[in-house]
Amino acid sequence: MIDADGFRPNVGIILTDDQGRLLWARRVGGQDAWQFPQGGIKHNESPENALYRELEEEVGLCKADVEVLGVTQGWLRYRLPRRLVRDKEPKCVGQKQKWYLLRLVSNDSAIRLDASSPAEFDTWNWVSYWYPLGKVVAFKRDVYRRALKELSPVYNQYFLSTLGEGRALC
């Protein structure tokens, strides 16, 4: 499902643990490409339903394993580098994304990268809030910055209320 401007609707997933760290996963393929889980929204699927489907497919978590803390207001877009643009119709020039900030309420042992085949990721780490900006592939960097910036007040408010005054993490 590509929109009239050539952007594919997609959800991005920022998953935090109780220490405020974010799940950062390495894509299968040996290029040392790390990113947040993300995936396309199917025809007639809501962004929220796509969120839970992608969460299960990519990291093996279900709705009961997470709590939604926030979501970006509008669509955040990025353009693909020319070498990755699909020229056949419908032409896809990039992604437009709704980003969700989730808190893991289960133990991190519930995270399973082999939940679907083929796997999207081969390993993962917990990282600090702003760490991904220096590591994500360049063409996604601006959308990551915008998503993290927009969701940082929600993130800070959650951790201020749970960790105490003066303990904001970003």
Curated annotation (Swiss-Prot):
Q: Which UniProt keywords apply?
A: Hydrolase
**Position of sequence motif Nudix box:** 39-60
UniProt keyword Cytoplasm present: no
Q: What is its EC number?
A: 3.6.1.-
The entry lists its GO molecular-function terms as: pyrophosphatase activity
Keyword Methyltransferase set for record: no
For this protein, the record's InterPro entries field holds: Nudix_hydrolase (IPR020476), NUDIX_hydrolase-like_dom_sf (IPR015797), NUDIX_hydrolase_CS (IPR020084), NUDIX_hydrolase_dom (IPR000086), RppH (IPR022927)
Name all Nudix hydrolase domain ranges: 6-149
Query: How would you classify this enzyme at the top EC level?
Result: hydrolase
Which cofactors does the annotated protein need, by name? a divalent metal cation
Taken from the record, one Pfam family name reads NUDIX
Please give the family membership noted in the entry.
Belongs to the Nudix hydrolase family. RppH subfamily.
Relate the protein's function as given in its record: Accelerates the degradation of transcripts by removing pyrophosphate from the 5'-end of triphosphorylated RNA, leading to a more labile monophosphorylated state that can stimulate subsequent ribonuclease cleavage.
Q: What is this protein called?
A: RNA pyrophosphohydrolase
> What organism does the record attribute this protein to?
Saccharophagus degradans (strain 2-40 / ATCC 43961 / DSM 17024)
Which gene is transcribed and translated to give this protein?
Answer: rppH
